[in-house]
Amino acid sequence: MFDPVDTYMNTLVPMVVEQTSRGERAYDIFSRLLKERIIFINGPIHDGMSHLIVAQLLHLEAENPNKEISIYINSPGGVVTSGLSIYDTMQYIKPKCSTLVIGQAASMGSVLLAGGEKGMRFSLPNSRIMVHQPSGGYQGQASDIMIHAAETQKLKDRLYDIYVKHTGQTKKAVEKALDRDNFMSPEEAKEWGHIDEIVESRSKGDDAE
């Protein structure tokens, strides 16, 4: 069984040391970036990841409800309900969430990318975006399989509605696009309404001082 905590603890995470008025303080790199209101969604999306991302979003809202949150995405997708918990929290909190795909935003990762604030959804030039309909496998009694199939259909319709809301496409166009695995370049994703801009470098106004 997949253990996200074990995976995290056995992955080398760089530490950074910061000088403060009280001396030195060490952070793991992701905690240090969280101080700058940067959240990473990296790897498969599952319950272990989603509750950490949701907690970070709520923490940053409590810290400053008026300051933007930046979400960097490199994910092949994962569990639909886990992804929707992150998506719903992004929509729920007061701070605007900008999204940037680095590498790939596939399946549920693409939903989170599209769910960023309009005008603040970005892609690096060599990233890939993939959309498709949800899938699942079930076993057991025929009646239970039918129940799960009906629930999958409801989730599919809900995801279609989310894409319609954030891309500006019609329901029919979304259904056609998601019928099979549909890979898009950043240029294609921008034309489809999935992202707003393709960025190759930081603007001068974004340079660290």
UniProtKB/Swiss-Prot annotation:
<keyword id="KW-0720">Serine protease</keyword>
<dbReference type="InterPro" id="IPR023562">
    <property type="entry name" value="ClpP/TepA"/>
</dbReference>
<dbReference type="InterPro" id="IPR001907">
    <property type="entry name" value="ClpP"/>
</dbReference>
<comment type="subunit">
    <text>Fourteen ClpP subunits assemble into 2 heptameric rings which stack back to back to give a disk-like structure with a central cavity, resembling the structure of eukaryotic proteasomes.</text>
</comment>
<keyword id="KW-0378">Hydrolase</keyword>
<feature type="active site">
    <location>
        <position position="132"/>
    </location>
</feature>
<dbReference type="Pfam" id="PF00574">
    <property type="entry name" value="CLP_protease"/>
</dbReference>
<keyword id="KW-0645">Protease</keyword>
<dbReference type="InterPro" id="IPR018215">
    <property type="entry name" value="ClpP_Ser_AS"/>
</dbReference>
<dbReference type="GO" id="GO:0006515">
    <property type="term" value="P:protein quality control for misfolded or incompletely synthesized proteins"/>
</dbReference>
<dbReference type="GO" id="GO:0051117">
    <property type="term" value="F:ATPase binding"/>
</dbReference>
<comment type="similarity">
    <text>Belongs to the peptidase S14 family.</text>
</comment>
<comment type="function">
    <text>Cleaves peptides in various proteins in a process that requires ATP hydrolysis. Has a chymotrypsin-like activity. Plays a major role in the degradation of misfolded proteins.</text>
</comment>
<protein>
    <recommendedName>
        <fullName>ATP-dependent Clp protease proteolytic subunit</fullName>
        <ecNumber>3.4.21.92</ecNumber>
    </recommendedName>
</protein>
<dbReference type="GO" id="GO:0009368">
    <property type="term" value="C:endopeptidase Clp complex"/>
</dbReference>
<keyword id="KW-0963">Cytoplasm</keyword>
<dbReference type="GO" id="GO:0004252">
    <property type="term" value="F:serine-type endopeptidase activity"/>
</dbReference>
<dbReference type="GO" id="GO:0005737">
    <property type="term" value="C:cytoplasm"/>
</dbReference>
<dbReference type="InterPro" id="IPR033135">
    <property type="entry name" value="ClpP_His_AS"/>
</dbReference>
<dbReference type="GO" id="GO:0004176">
    <property type="term" value="F:ATP-dependent peptidase activity"/>
</dbReference>
<feature type="active site" description="Nucleophile">
    <location>
        <position position="107"/>
    </location>
</feature>
<dbReference type="InterPro" id="IPR029045">
    <property type="entry name" value="ClpP/crotonase-like_dom_sf"/>
</dbReference>
